Amino acid sequence: MEALVYTFLLVSTLGIIFFAIFFREPPKVPTKKN
């Protein structure tokens, strides 16, 4: 059961880091929203 918890924490941490980096850098593709 501990392995499942640690796996979930690892995936969520990597997801948050990727999310932050992706939205911190300017998008390469021009968007119509901004």
Curated annotation (Swiss-Prot):
<dbReference type="GO" id="GO:0015979">
    <property type="term" value="P:photosynthesis"/>
</dbReference>
<feature type="transmembrane region" description="Helical">
    <location>
        <begin position="3"/>
        <end position="23"/>
    </location>
</feature>
<keyword id="KW-0812">Transmembrane</keyword>
<dbReference type="GO" id="GO:0009535">
    <property type="term" value="C:chloroplast thylakoid membrane"/>
</dbReference>
<keyword id="KW-0602">Photosynthesis</keyword>
<protein>
    <recommendedName>
        <fullName>Photosystem II reaction center protein T</fullName>
    </recommendedName>
</protein>
<keyword id="KW-0472">Membrane</keyword>
<keyword id="KW-0604">Photosystem II</keyword>
<keyword id="KW-0793">Thylakoid</keyword>
<keyword id="KW-1133">Transmembrane helix</keyword>
<keyword id="KW-0150">Chloroplast</keyword>
<keyword id="KW-0934">Plastid</keyword>
<dbReference type="InterPro" id="IPR001743">
    <property type="entry name" value="PSII_PsbT"/>
</dbReference>
<comment type="subunit">
    <text>PSII is composed of 1 copy each of membrane proteins PsbA, PsbB, PsbC, PsbD, PsbE, PsbF, PsbH, PsbI, PsbJ, PsbK, PsbL, PsbM, PsbT, PsbY, PsbZ, Psb30/Ycf12, at least 3 peripheral proteins of the oxygen-evolving complex and a large number of cofactors. It forms dimeric complexes.</text>
</comment>
<comment type="similarity">
    <text>Belongs to the PsbT family.</text>
</comment>
<comment type="function">
    <text>Found at the monomer-monomer interface of the photosystem II (PS II) dimer, plays a role in assembly and dimerization of PSII. PSII is a light-driven water plastoquinone oxidoreductase, using light energy to abstract electrons from H(2)O, generating a proton gradient subsequently used for ATP formation.</text>
</comment>
<dbReference type="Pfam" id="PF01405">
    <property type="entry name" value="PsbT"/>
</dbReference>
<dbReference type="InterPro" id="IPR037268">
    <property type="entry name" value="PSII_PsbT_sf"/>
</dbReference>
<dbReference type="GO" id="GO:0009539">
    <property type="term" value="C:photosystem II reaction center"/>
</dbReference>
